């Protein structure tokens, strides 16, 4: 049974790396895996905690513009934007969910790419150049039991 094997593999983990690809929503399992990793699961008197999650954006045709684009706010701040319809709601609902919000810029109210969302997005090349940075960021969020984030744990 695939679901049982996945549960066994994920139960003792603390960080989940989600590869954000153009075909992510075609998978029958990814949104379920994310939901499972966000829950506290009890087995034999032991409870697993919410995993930290990092979304690694797959490089396609040499770039990331299939999913990510940059815009400039009226105050001059450059911010990353994403085509939200390309990923599952459980991912979108755990983005920009820091509470209370800590703004990188108080004028335009933009947030940090790493801390403004429970599920941070990072480009594949950036992730591969320093995976520890992004895994540690997700791990720290999970170790604090997602404190400071309004989590959506259901698909």
PLM regions and their residue ranges:
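C-terminal interaction surface of TIR/SEFIR-family domains
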Residues: 62-155
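Conserved TIR/SEFIR loop-to-helix hotspot centered on a Trp-containing motif
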Residues: 23-40
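Conserved beta-strand segments of the P-loop GTPase G domain that flank and frequently precede/overlap
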Residues: 18-21, 55-57
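Inter-motif core of Ras-like GTPase G domains
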Residues: 12-18
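Short beta-alpha junction loops
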Residues: 49-69
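Conserved BB-loop
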Residues: 1-6, 26
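Arginine/glycine-rich "motif VI" loop of SF2 helicases in the C-terminal RecA-like domain
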Residues: 39-50
């Amino acid at each position: 049974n695939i679901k049982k094997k996945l549960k066994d593999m994920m139960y003792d983990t603390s960080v989940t790396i989600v590869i954000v690809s153009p075909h992510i929503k075609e998978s029958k399992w990814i949104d379920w895996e994310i939901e499972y990793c966000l829950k506290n699961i009890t087995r034999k008197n032991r409870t697993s905690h919410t995993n930290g999650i990092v979304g690694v954006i797959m490089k396609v045709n040499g770039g990331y513009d299939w999913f990510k684009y940059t815009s400039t706010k009226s105050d001059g701040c450059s911010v990353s934007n994403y085509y939200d319809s390309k990923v599952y709601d459980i991912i979108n609902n755990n983005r920009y969910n820091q509470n209370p919000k800590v703004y990188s810029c108080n004028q335009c109210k933009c947030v940090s790419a790493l801390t403004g969302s429970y599920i941070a997005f990072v480009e594949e090349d950036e992730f591969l150049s320093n995976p520890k940075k992004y895994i540690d960021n997700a791990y720290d969020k999970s170790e604090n039991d997602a404190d400071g984030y309004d989590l959506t744990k259901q698909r």
